[in-house]
A protein has these predicted regions:
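Positively charged, low-complexity intrinsically disordered leader regions
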Residues: 1-61, 65
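Conserved beta-strand segments of alpha/beta enzyme cores
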Residues: 3, 73, 125-128
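Short N-terminal micro-motifs specific to bacterial/archaeal maturation
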Residues: 6-9, 82-85, 106
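Residues at the C-termini of beta-strands that transition into short coil/loop
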Residues: 8, 78, 129
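Anion-binding alpha/beta catalytic cores of soluble intermediary-metabolism enzymes, centered on
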Residues: 32, 86, 92-98, 102-132
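Charge-rich, low-complexity amphipathic helices
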Residues: 40-41, 70, 89-90, 120-121
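Active-site cofactor/substrate anionic-group-binding motifs, chiefly glycine-
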Residues: 47-101
Length: 132
């Protein structure tokens, strides 16, 4: 799976696998500190770029801890740090720059149009897609 935009786009089989894997992973974490990475560190060396047009403490922290627990790193970008077609930098340019530095992307926005445009423009590393 290379994106998770709408739950209706995921097959029942894939959704069951996601939930089963999450339950199994959560059970293995019982003895670990919440900042300690999972033993298999599946996202070691991977980088999540979180983009927030709408602030959310709970979303930001849950994604940050999840990526840490899976062995990766994260960067948070606030609305004032993003240039989606504003200030002389096009959304295409922004997506290209983000693609150079990130492996995984998360956008919290009110705009389905902006989300779908970013999805179309952002390039995700093919070796990461093959592992998932």
């Amino acid at each position: 799976m290379n994106n998770f935009i709408n739950i209706r786009d995921i097959s029942v089989k894939d959704l069951k696998k996601i939930l089963f894997d999450a339950k199994k992973r959560k059970a293995k974490r019982k003895k670990l500190n919440y900042l300690e990475p999972d033993k298999d560190i599946p996202l070691k060396g991977r980088f999540l770029i979180q983009m927030f047009e709408k602030s959310s403490t709970r979303t930001r922290l849950s994604f940050y801890l999840a990526i840490r627990q899976l062995g990766g790193g994260a960067l948070n970008l606030r609305k004032d740090e993003l240039h989606f077609g504003e200030g002389g930098e096009s959304i295409h340019d922004t997506a290209k720059i983000l693609s150079n530095y990130g492996d995984i992307f998360m956008l919290r926005t009110d705009s389905d149009k902006k989300l779908l445009e970013l999805l179309r423009l952002i390039m995700v590393s093919q070796d990461l897609l093959q592992k998932m």
